């Protein structure tokens, strides 16, 4: 198993910080191979927010109740908010690789909304991108090296990550709308050209396919 992590002030404790709009607390990578299972269970959640990006494999998440299970595949991002139940597992057989980041701040809720991460959603289809992984690795390095103005750099890098997430979410939404528009246009054209025939609902999709 490969692990690479960085923690603000070398502290593993979760915290809430309202002194600044956005504060990164920790960030890391887990890459499972032969390890059978890596579980996390926080019944009362944490004080901060957490983003988990699944780069490969699968994540087994239990939202709201421990008995609920949602399998989240690669190419998705999971968002946990403060004090939400956090129960999830990764399995070596899935060859799972995840990137995670914990953050807090006085304006996090509005920042997330501004980048299209709605309050009632936990899983976001952000796709797979090396750019995501590069940003996570930069954040880890900043936490490990603690160079001048690194806390400000951490906040900027997190915003960068949120922006590229939003761009992909917006692109997916546009592609879906374009697909629906094309399908609707094809259906209207077919009906116009065959208005004098008996048209069965069963054959219509095949004619437009």
Predicted features and spans:
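A short, N-terminal "cap"/entry segment at the start of jelly-roll beta-barrel domains
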Residues: 1-23, 142-145, 170
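N-terminal regulatory/effector-sensing and dimerization cores
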Residues: 2, 10-12, 19, 26-118, ...
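Short, flexible segments with low predicted structural confidence
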Residues: 22-24, 72, 133, 175-177
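Generic structural concept
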Residues: 48, 155-158
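Hydrophobic-face residues of short alpha-helical interaction/recognition segments
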Residues: 108, 161-162
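Short, Lys/Arg-enriched, Trp-marked, Pro/Gly-tolerant hinge/linker segments that flank
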Residues: 119-130, 143-156, 163-208
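A structural motif
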Residues: 128-138
């Amino acid at each position: 198993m490969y692990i690479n992590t960085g923690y603000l002030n070398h502290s593993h404790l979760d915290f809430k910080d309202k002194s600044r709009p956005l504060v990164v607390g920790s960030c890391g990578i887990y890459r499972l191979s032969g390890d059978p299972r890596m579980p996390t269970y926080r019944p009362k959640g944490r004080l901060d927010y957490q983003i988990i990006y699944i780069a490969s494999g699968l994540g087994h998440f239990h939202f709201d109740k421990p008995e609920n299970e949602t399998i989240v595949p690669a190419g998705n991002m999971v968002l946990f908010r403060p004090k939400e139940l956090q129960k999830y597992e990764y399995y070596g057989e899935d060859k799972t690789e995840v990137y995670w980041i914990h953050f807090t701040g006085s304006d996090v809720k509005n920042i997330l909304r501004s980048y299209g991460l709605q309050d009632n959603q936990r899983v976001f289809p952000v796709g797979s991108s090396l750019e995501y992984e590069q940003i996570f690795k930069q954040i880890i390095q900043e936490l490990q090296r603690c160079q001048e103005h690194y806390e400000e750099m951490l906040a900027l890098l997190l915003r960068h990550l949120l922006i590229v997430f939003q761009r992909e979410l917006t692109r997916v939404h546009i592609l879906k709308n374009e697909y629906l528009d094309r399908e609707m246009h094809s259906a209207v054209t077919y009906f116009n050209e065959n208005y004098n025939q008996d048209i069965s609902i069963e054959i219509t999709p095949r004619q437009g396919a």
